[in-house]
């Protein structure tokens, strides 16, 4: 755990860009406050590692299972045509994956999703509304 890391420290650091949706076995799911892609989330590992190879096989499998659970919830709640998956970590050295719902003929369809955290930022009430929808879809 690194208390200078937004995902480890949680609180104010992660609140700048994310809103906690729920805890899963191997990760925490955050709604990305910038919602130019409705339903965009981040699945952050509970382990402070930079690379998938730093996780044990069991931890890696559990993390991927959380990603799949979250993707299923996105499809159920938002009905995207495609979910894009992105793992970068050049500047934030904590394993996390962006799940970005994409909709045919809408914003950035056919291209890479942007990382502009101020494009279409939701307030706390709007975040909770979307998070509640995701929580319900995750619970099944």
Residue ranges and their predicted role:
Residues 1-140:
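HIT superfamily nucleotide-processing domains
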